[in-house]
């Protein structure tokens, strides 16, 4: 759908064809006797494609675009929050960052983009250099595409909770971290996640691709290291289980530290401190993954860490999350060490 949306920008297909596609996808929300996850899936498909083509549709098909957004707004108003939301949260508390459901978050981001007249800054558009040629291109009308009817055997996108670790106060003053409801935040995170999914089993290419992402983006300077760390931990802590083996995340984070030694290790250490501070409300499975990754990471740096900074854990009961995390980390460190270390 996103590919078809970008084809509108290159004048390959007409705006009307894309509007018809969006309408057919959104009409799924009006079907009877279907699971909510089906409606969520097709609404997300439309919302995630809008940033690429919303400006063009706003200029040429404003009324039709408004009608689609009003239909989505009506659906979001009557929609019930998934029962799995609390089970998928990394933290049991919304302090300091609310843990939003993925569909509610992108709807808030699209609503803010709409208020800003559909202006975004971080989508790479190489075709703008050929605008003089493309403006004369013959646009094509695509045959109507309708979603298949629901079958009990259908598998839809699993519900997700958006992981948030940093905000602008955690970043250097010279950088600007887009807000959680900024579409720029979604675009950057989505592109980094795409790079990770594409290259996760080639750690060097994956790390290089992530760090080179800003070379393709347009707009203000952003603290890319912070966004990368947040995306990586969000993938690592995904519930009920992470998409890839834990070693994928750990090895890529190591290569990121090697490729960007002046800044990335410091940002990663800052993230570890924030995670440690919030262990009290962290999901138990995520604490275990955190300890396993941290021990692996330390094993590649001679197990060096400012352990004195965590002496506060001595004041708690042994089963409190903080001393328990430290104990598990040390156990993993023992497994990863050998006599000469």
What residue ranges belong to the model's regions?
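HEAT-repeat alpha-solenoid elements in large eukaryotic scaffold proteins
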Residues: 1-4, 41-50, 200-211, 224-231, ...
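Extended alpha-helical scaffolding segments
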Residues: 2-116, 257-340
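Active-site-adjacent structural elements in folded domains
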Residues: 29-33, 211-219, 233-239, 253-259, ...
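Long, low-complexity, highly charged intrinsically disordered regions
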Residues: 79-238, 319-341
């Amino acid at each position: 759908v996103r590919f078809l949306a970008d084809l509108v920008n290159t004048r390959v297909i007409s705006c009307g064809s894309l509007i018809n596609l969006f309408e057919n996808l959104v009409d799924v929300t009006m079907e009877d006797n279907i699971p909510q996850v089906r409606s969520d899936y097709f609404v997300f498909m439309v919302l995630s494609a809008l940033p690429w083509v919303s400006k063009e549709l706003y200029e040429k098909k404003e009324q039709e675009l408004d009608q689609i957004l009003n239909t989505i707004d009506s659906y979001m108003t009557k929609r019930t929050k998934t029962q799995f939301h609390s089970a998928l949260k990394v933290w049991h508390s919304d302090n300091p960052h609310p843990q939003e459901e993925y569909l509610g978050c992108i709807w808030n981001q699209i609503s803010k983009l709409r208020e800003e007249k559909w202006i975004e800054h971080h989508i790479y558009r190489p075709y703008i250099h050929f605008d003089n040629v493309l403006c004369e291109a013959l646009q094509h009308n695509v045959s109507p595409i309708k979603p298949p009817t629901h079958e009990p055997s259908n598998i839809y996108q699993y519900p997700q909770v958006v992981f948030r670790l940093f905000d602008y106060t955690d970043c250097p003053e010279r950088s600007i971290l887009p807000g959680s409801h900024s579409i720029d935040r979604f675009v950057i995170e989505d592109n980094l996640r795409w790079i990770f999914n594409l290259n996760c089993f080639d750690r060097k290419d994956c790390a290089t691709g992530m760090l080179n992402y800003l070379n393709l983006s347009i707009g203000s300077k952003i603290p890319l290291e912070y966004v990368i760390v947040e995306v990586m931990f969000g993938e690592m802590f995904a519930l009920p289980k992470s998409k890839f083996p834990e070693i994928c995340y750990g090895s890529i984070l190591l290569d990121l530290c090697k490729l960007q030694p002046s800044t990335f290790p410091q940002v990663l250490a800052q993230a570890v401190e924030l995670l440690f501070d919030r262990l009290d409300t962290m999901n138990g499975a995520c604490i275990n993954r955190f300890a396993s990754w941290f021990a692996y990471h330390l094993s590649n740096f001679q197990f060096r860490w400012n352990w004195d900074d965590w002496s506060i854990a001595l004041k708690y009961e042994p089963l409190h999350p903080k001393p328990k995390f430290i104990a598990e980390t040390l156990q993993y460190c023992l497994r990863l060490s050998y006599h000469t270390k």
